[in-house]
C-alpha cells in the first residue's frame, strides 16, 4: 500500500460497501415461522411437552439413589481405583434409565455409524460439535464413560451423584493446582491399558451453534495417547435443539425440542487417531490436527473461535478480540446514567497534562459525575487493576473517546499514542510494549502476552525501543491484518460502519498479511 492512499475514517477503498453482519458461532435464535409451524408447536407444546418433561424428570430422579448405591460404603482409597467391574448391575440400570429418559425427550432412535474402539485401543473419546445440553446422550451410546466436569457440579442434585457414579474427573477453578492434578489423572487413566473406563471430552469446552468447529482445548490431548473422534449430527428440518451462549434460553430449547414428534440424531465413530511424536510433545498441535480431521468429516470449517471466561473471542492475527466488544455496553450504561460525551475531551486533557493517572472507584465516580454505585462498579471492573486496586484513567479516557462516532479512526489512533507514549532520552515520544498492551487491552480486551507478540513483530525492523506515532498509526490504519480493528471493529455502532474484523479461518493473517511482507513501521 503506498503512502498516497487515504487513511481516513472509512478505510481503504476495498473495504467500502454495505455493512456485513459478523458471524458469531455462539449465537443461535430460532422462532417457529408460518401459521402451520406455529400451530404445531403450540398444540404439541401444550399437550406433548408437559407429558414428556414430567416423564423425563421422573426417570432422571430415579437414577439418583441407584447412582449413589454404587459408591456407597467405598473408601477414598477404593474410589481412587477403577470400580468399573464392581456392582455392574447398577451400571446396567443407569444405562437403561438414561436411554429411557432421552427417549421420553424425543430421541426415539439414534443412527450409529462406525465402531466404538475399546478402552485399551482408545482410552479417550473426543466429541464435537458441542451444540446443546442434549449432547450428553452420547455417553449412553458410549456405555457411560467418565467425563471431566467442574467440582462445583457435585453439589447439584442427581448430577453430582451421576458424576460420582462414573468416577468423573473433577476440576476446580479455585484451586491453582487443580488443573495439574487433572492432567495427571487423565494421563494415569489413559495409560491404564483399559483398566479404567474411557474418558469422554467435548474439546470445544463450550456450546456453539454447530456451523463451525470451535477451537479445541488441549486438555484431552496432554496424555499424548490415541483418541477416537466422535461426530454428532442433528439432521432435523428445524434447528430446535441448539443452545448457545446467546440466544434461546434453556426452557425455550426444551419446549421447542419436546414439542416435536421425534428428534433425529446421528453419532459417527471415526477411526482411532494415533498422534505423531511431534503431536505427542505438543498438545496444542495434536488438538489442532484432530479438529481438522473432524471438521473435514463434518464438512465444516475448523476455526479458532473460543470462549475465554464468559467472553466469546475471535482471533485477529496474534490477538484475541471479543466478538461483541464490551466497550459499547459500557457506553450504553453510562449514557443511561446521565454521562455525556461532551465532557470526554476535558477528561482527555487532564490525562495529557498528567493531572490524572490512576484512580480508585470513588475518584472514578467523581470524574465521570456518575452517582449510581452499580453503574460505576461495572465500569470500574472492566479495566485492569494494579496491585493497589487502582485503574489507569488513560484507559478510561480512550474507551470513552472510542464512543464518539464523529472521531475518525486515525484521530482515535493518534489519541491512543498521545495518551500512552513516553519521552525517551533523545526527546522522542515512543510507545513502549507496556503502552501498546494497555491500548489493546482497554479497547479490545487482548491479553498482554498476545499484544507483546504483535509489538515484537512491529519493532523487528527498527532500531528504536518503541513505536513512533507514525508507526503506530500505520499499524492501526494500514496494517493488512490489524487495521480492521480501528477502521471497523472499533467504530461505534451508531457510526454505521461496523464490520467484522478480517478473520482467516485458522485465525492468522494470510500470506500477504505476513509482517515480513510489510515495510518497516518505525
UniProtKB/Swiss-Prot annotation:
**Which intervals of this chain are the motif HXXXXD motif?**
130-135
Which SMART domains did the record assign? Answer: PlsC
Molecular function (GO) terms listed?
Answer: 1-acylglycerophosphocholine O-acyltransferase activity; 1-acylglycerophosphoethanolamine O-acyltransferase activity; 1-acylglycerophosphoserine O-acyltransferase activity; 1-alkenylglycerophosphoethanolamine O-acyltransferase activity; 1-alkylglycerophosphocholine O-acetyltransferase activity
Indicate which residues are glycosylated according to the record. 166, 517
- Where, per UniProt, does this protein localize? Endoplasmic reticulum membrane
Listed Polar residues bias regions: 503-522
Q: What GO terms describe the biological role, i.e. biological process, of this protein?
A: phospholipid biosynthetic process
Q: Which InterPro entries match?
A: EF-hand-dom_pair, LPCAT1-like, Plipid/glycerol_acylTrfase
- Membrane topology listed for this record: Multi-pass membrane protein
State the source organism's domain of life. Eukaryota
| Record field: transmembrane | 43-63, 92-112
Q: Known EC number(s)? A: 2.3.1.23, 2.3.1.n6, 2.3.1.121, 2.3.1.67
Q: Which reaction does it catalyse?
A: a 1-acyl-sn-glycero-3-phosphoethanolamine + an acyl-CoA = a 1,2-diacyl-sn-glycero-3-phosphoethanolamine + CoA; a 1-O-(1Z-alkenyl)-sn-glycero-3-phosphoethanolamine + an acyl-CoA = a 1-O-(1Z-alkenyl)-2-acyl-sn-glycero-3-phosphoethanolamine + CoA; a 1-acyl-sn-glycero-3-phosphocholine + an acyl-CoA = a 1,2-diacyl-sn-glycero-3-phosphocholine + CoA; a 1-O-alkyl-sn-glycero-3-phosphocholine + acetyl-CoA = a 1-O-alkyl-2-acetyl-sn-glycero-3-phosphocholine + CoA
The pathway is: Lipid metabolism; phospholipid metabolism
Gene Ontology CC terms: endoplasmic reticulum membrane
Region ranges (Disordered): 496-522
Q: What SUPFAM superfamilies does UniProt report for this protein, alphabetically?
A: EF-hand, Glycerol-3-phosphate (1)-acyltransferase
Record-linked PANTHER family: LYSOPHOSPHOLIPID ACYLTRANSFERASE LPCAT4 (PTHR23063:SF7), PHOSPHOLIPID ACYLTRANSFERASE (PTHR23063)
Tell me which family the UniProt entry assigns to this protein: Belongs to the 1-acyl-sn-glycerol-3-phosphate acyltransferase family.
- Biological role stated in the UniProt entry: Displays acyl-CoA-dependent lysophospholipid acyltransferase activity with a subset of lysophospholipids as substrates. Prefers long chain acyl-CoAs (C16, C18) as acyl donors.
Q: What is the name of this protein?
A: Lysophospholipid acyltransferase LPCAT4
Q: What's the gene?
A: lpcat4
Amino acid at each position: 500500500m503506498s503512502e498516497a492512499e487515504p487513511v481516513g475514517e472509512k478505510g481503504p477503498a476495498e473495504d467500502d460497501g454495505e455493512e456485513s453482519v459478523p458471524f458469531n458461532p455462539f449465537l443461535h435464535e430460532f422462532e417457529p415461522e408460518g401459521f402451520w409451524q406455529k400451530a404445531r408447536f403450540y398444540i404439541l407444546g401444550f399437550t406433548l411437552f408437559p407429558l414428556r418433561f414430567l416423564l423425563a424428570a421422573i426417570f432422571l430422579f430415579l437414577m439418583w439413589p441407584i447412582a449413589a448405591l454404587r459408591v456407597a460404603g467405598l473408601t477414598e482409597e477404593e474410589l481412587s481405583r477403577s470400580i468399573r467391574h464392581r456392582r455392574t448391575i447398577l451400571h446396567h440400570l443407569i444405562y437403561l434409565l438414561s436411554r429411557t429418559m432421552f427417549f421420553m425427550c424425543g430421541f426415539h432412535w439414534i443412527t450409529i455409524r462406525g465402531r466404538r474402539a475399546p478402552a485399551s485401543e482408545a482410552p479417550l473419546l473426543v466429541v464435537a460439535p458441542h451444540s446443546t445440553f442434549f449432547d450428553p446422550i452420547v455417553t449412553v451410546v458410549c456405555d457411560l464413560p467418565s467425563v471431566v466436569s467442574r467440582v462445583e457440579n457435585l453439589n447439584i442434585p442427581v448430577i453430582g451423584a451421576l458424576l460420582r457414579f462414573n468416577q468423573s474427573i473433577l476440576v476446580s477453578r479455585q484451586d491453582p493446582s487443580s488443573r495439574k492434578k487433572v492432567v495427571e489423572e487423565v494421563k494415569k487413566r489413559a495409560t491404564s491399558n483399559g483398566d479404567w473406563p474411557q474418558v469422554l471430552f467435548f474439546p470445544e469446552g463450550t456450546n456453539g451453534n454447530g456451523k463451525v468447529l470451535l477451537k479445541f482445548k488441549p486438555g484431552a490431548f496432554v496424555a499424548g495417547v490415541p483418541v477416537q473422534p466422535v461426530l454428532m449430527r442433528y439432521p432435523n428440518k428445524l434447528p430446535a435443539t441448539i443452545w448457545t451462549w446467546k440466544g434461546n434460553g434453556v426452557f425455550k430449547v426444551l419446549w421447542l425440542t419436546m414439542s416435536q414428534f421425534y428428534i433425529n440424531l446421528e453419532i459417527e465413530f471415526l477411526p482411532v487417531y494415533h498422534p505423531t511424536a511431534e503431536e505427542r510433545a505438543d498438545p496444542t498441535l495434536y488438538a489442532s490436527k484432530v479438529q481438522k480431521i473432524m471438521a473435514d468429516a463434518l464438512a465444516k470449517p475448523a476455526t479458532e473461535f473460543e470462549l475465554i471466561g464468559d467472553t466469546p473471542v475471535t482471533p485477529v492475527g496474534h490477538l484475541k478480540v471479543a466478538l461483541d466488544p464490551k466497550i459499547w455496553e459500557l457506553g450504553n450504561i453510562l449514557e443511561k446514567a446521565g454521562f455525556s460525551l461532551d465532557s470526554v475531551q476535558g477528561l482527555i486533557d487532564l490525562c495529557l497534562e498528567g493531572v490524572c493517572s490512576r484512580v480508585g472507584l470513588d475518584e472514578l465516580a467523581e470524574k465521570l459525575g456518575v452517582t449510581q454505585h452499580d453503574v460505576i462498579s461495572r465500569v470500574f471492573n472492566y479495566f485492569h487493576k494494579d496491585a493497589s486496586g487502582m485503574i489507569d484513567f488513560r484507559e478510561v479516557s480512550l474507551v470513552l473517546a472510542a464512543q464518539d462516532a464523529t472521531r475518525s479512526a486515525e484521530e482515535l489512533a493518534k489519541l491512543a499514542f498521545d495518551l500512552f507514549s513516553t519521552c525517551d532520552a533523545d526527546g522522542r515520544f515512543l510507545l513502549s510494549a507496556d503502552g501498546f498492551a494497555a491500548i489493546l487491552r482497554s479497547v479490545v480486551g487482548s491479553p498482554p502476552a498476545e499484544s507483546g507478540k504483535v509489538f515484537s513483530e512491529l519493532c523487528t525492523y527498527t532500531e528504536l525501543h518503541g513505536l513512533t506515532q507514525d508507526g503506530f498509526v500505520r499499524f492501526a490504519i494500514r496494517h493488512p491484518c490489524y487495521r480492521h480493528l480501528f477502521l471497523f471493529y472499533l467504530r461505534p455502532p451508531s457510526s454505521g460502519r461496523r464490520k467484522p474484523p478480517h478473520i482467516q479461518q485458522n485465525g492468522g493473517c494470510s500470506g500477504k498479511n505476513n509482517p515480513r511482507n510489510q515495510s518497516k513501521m518505525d
